[in-house]
Amino acid sequence: MEVEPPLYPVAGAAGPQGDEDRHGVPDGPEAPLDELVGAYPNYNEEEEERRYYRRKRLGVVKNVLAASTGVTLTYGVYLGLLQMQLILHYDETYREVKYGNMGLPDIDSKMLMGINVTPIAALLYTPVLIRFFGTKWMMFLAVGIYALFVSTNYWERYYTLVPSAVALGMAIVPLWASMGNYITRMSQKYYEYSHYKEQDEQGPQQRPPRGSHAPYLLVFQAIFYSFFHLSFACAQLPMIYFLNNYLYDLNHTLINVQSCGTKSQGILNGFNKTVLRTLPRSKNLIVVESVLMAVAFLAMLMVLGLCGAAYRPTEEIDLRSVGWGNIFQLPFKHVRDFRLRHLVPFFIYSGFEVLFACTGFALGYGVCSMGLERLAYLLIAYSLGASASSVLGLLGLWLPRSVPLVAGAGLHLLLTLSLFFWAPAPRVLQHSWIFYFVAALWGVGSALNKTGLSTLLGILYEDKERQDFIFTIYHWWQAVAIFVVYLGSSLPMKAKLAVLLVTLVAAAASYLWMEQKLQQGLVPRQPRIPKPQHKVRGYRYLEEDNSDESDMEGEQGQGDCAEDEAPQAGPLGAEPAGPCRKPCPYEQALGGDGPEEQ
């Protein structure tokens, strides 16, 4: 009986073919080592490297799209819910039937105060929170707080609405500061992954040239604001598909309104106290709020699962290791920089113009003349105009960077002057297309303003150790402007337009003055970022260069090393410790060069 041959040949065993396999390669002890453990014969290192960095670039694009979509859904849910609840709570019949003498108007005023007043303190804690949690996790936490605010509207009481509104007010500035930092970091990463060969030639610790990431930053900011401005349109979906079915027409709601536009005083003076024909059933309200809650939860999952980290783990350790006291002080120290001081009026105007579009123009001009049932379509016109015009921020690829900002300011200047002399008659719809046209044009100016400012800050402050401070200052001033608008909501329309006009002119003049100073070669004074102080000296911190060292500090360090004498070889042929590097513990033990003996 013949023995069946083994399925696999035994190494070193002589078979019918001797000590060679079917490819003619010797088997057993004489087999060459390269044939066993060598590289794959068809492996192309350059092609694999190209594919690797292509996947990295696609990952960066995925991060930008996920962050943009998450913020769009979050703000669409937040603005839509807030608008729907304020309209329902305004109707006195709804308040009396649903809530009796609970004092719903007082709760609403406290809720709005929590949303608008709390961000004033954000400058004190935002950089600390971003450095403590990290950029991505700060975004996730802030989006979760927005979802918490949505969930509390299931049970509308003082102890649910007001605390959640205060928490939401605390999360506004951290969300936007971390988002601006995140988009800027993604543009820098995309540059690194696109020019990886240059990075290999220059060395891993060499910073890329100044402004090299600017083209990618322009594209990513245009994508982000194209998505974000759609949130104003998404916020109108509950109004269109649900609330408009219960509203009275303009002949009832505007029966006592005498003047609109530039002649108006406060917010809708004389507006009817009853705006609902029939009261919506509680079951229908729960269904709408459940849909909004599901969308908010989806936004949380998108930020959590699809957004990658903005920094490497070692970079985040370095950013936190400068000291919490320094992190707290650095936003205030950056006021020394004349560029930030010149941009503060633009920061304030950026907050003014968004609130004016959503409250001043939409209510004082649009609703006052066309009725509450057309508010949603007016804001959709603003949203679509702003979203489509965010692409105009790409003009910075071919034109000077001041062109988008100045163009947006010029457009808003013309519209503001026109609104000074426009007082539309109440309950007149013959020229309703003018309202939609003005809203769309205002959206164009808003898009140029937002994309221009965010791109400018990302170009002027591209050091990763400064970006969270800069975007915190930017959005804190926006929050201050929104607080001022909240305080002045009862002013006459002419006073609001005058404040808007003066701020706009001052912002444009201050910005052009800043650009002139930069062209003259005036060097801004920036605070020094302290070096990381690590409690544990691991292998990561024995590298030659510090990942958080600025260019000026690096040049000074190299100059100091050039003056020093060449280090002598240690015992047993130990190699020199390298320029500007302390000896590792092993070298200190061999050479007696530890800190105790210096």
Swiss-Prot record:
**What induces or represses this gene?**
Upon interleukin-4 treatment in B-cells.
Major site of localization recorded for this protein: endoplasmic reticulum
Q: Changing residue 36 to A: what effect?
A: Increases the TLR7 response and decreases the TLR9 response
UniProt keywords (A-Z) are:
Adaptive immunity, Antiviral defense, Cytoplasmic vesicle, Endoplasmic reticulum, Endosome, Glycoprotein, Immunity, Innate immunity, Lysosome, Membrane, Phosphoprotein, Transmembrane, Transmembrane helix
Q: What is the effect of changing residue 281 to A?
A: Strongly decreases interaction with TLR3
Question: How the protein assembles, per its UniProt entry?
Answer: Interacts with TLR3, TLR5, TLR7, TLR8, TLR9 and TLR13 (probably via transmembrane domain).
Q: What does this protein do?
A: Plays an important role in innate and adaptive immunity by regulating nucleotide-sensing Toll-like receptor (TLR) signaling. Required for the transport of a subset of TLRs (including TLR3, TLR7 and TLR9) from the endoplasmic reticulum to endolysosomes where they can engage pathogen nucleotides and activate signaling cascades. May play a role in autoreactive B-cells removal.
List the protein's name.
Protein unc-93 homolog B1
Organism for this UniProt entry? Mus musculus
> Gene name, please?
Unc93b1
